[in-house]
Amino acid sequence: KREQKYQCPNHKIFISPSTFEYETEQENLLWYDSADKNLYSEIKKVKRESRIARDNSEDALTWNVMRFLDRQGLLADFLSQLSNKKITESELILWSYSPKEKSDWTLLNQARVEFGETIARGSEPDIIIRTNKVLYFIEAKLTANNETTPSEVDNRKKYETGGNKLFQQIFKSDYETVAEKRYELMRFWLLGSWMAKQLKLDFEFYSLVMQSRELEIEATFGKHITETTKRKFSRLTWEQIYAFIKLLPDNKEKHIMTEYFENKTIGYNNSIGTIIKAFNV
C-alpha cells in the first residue's frame, strides 16, 4: 500500500511483501526526455491499467526495452533478424496508441468491433509493430503467465462469427477448449490475423517471456491454431533481445540498457530475504 508507514525514509520506495514500488512512475522508466514524456502521457489516455511504478512491472520493462529499440532506430534490424525478412519501415504501437494517428489505432478498434468487443474494454495488445511486410503482435510477460480465462464465461461476443467466421479458418480447437486456458492468446491471434488480412501483411504473434518461463508455450498454444508461412506464433525471450543489444556498437544508451537487463530484479523472496534476479544474463 502506498502509505507512509510502508515507505522507506531513505529511498522513498514503498515496501510490500513481494516487491517494492517507486514513489513516482518516472523513477522506473529509463527514457523520459520531452519526446518520451509526451508519448507516455498520450499512451496513458488510452491505456486502461498501469502499475508502472512497481519493480516487477511488465509495463515498465516493455517501455524501457521497446522505446530503446525505437529511439535508436533499431526495430527494423531486430525484426529482420527475428523474422528472416527484410523489414525496412516500422511503427511501434504500445498499448493500442498509434503515434501516427495520435490516438488508439483505428484498425485495432475496427477489429474489436468486428469481433463483438467494445472499444473501451476491447483487447489491448502490449506491443503492436506495423511494418512494410509483417504485422507483429507481441504479448509481454514478466512474472505473470499466459494462462487466462474469460471473466464472463457466457459472453462469447463474436469471436466465432466475426470476420466471416475467421475463427474456423485459423483455429484447430473449438472456442471452449482454447478459451479455457489461453483466452488472451486466442483473442490476439484472432484479431491480429484479421488485421493483417486487411493490411495484406503477414502476421507474426510472439509470446515474450523470461528465458526460464513457459518453455512449452509454442506447443501448448500451437496445438490449437492453424499456422501457415504467412501466419505464425512463436516464443520470444527478453534474453534474446538482450543478446541483440549486447552486439550493438557501444554508446551511452546501449550501456544503460545492458546494465538494466543485467541488474533487473522482480521483487524478493520474502521467506529468505533475497532479491530475485529477472534475467539469465
Regions found by a protein language model. Give the residues of each.
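Charged, terminal alpha-helix-loop-beta segments
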Residues: K1-V281
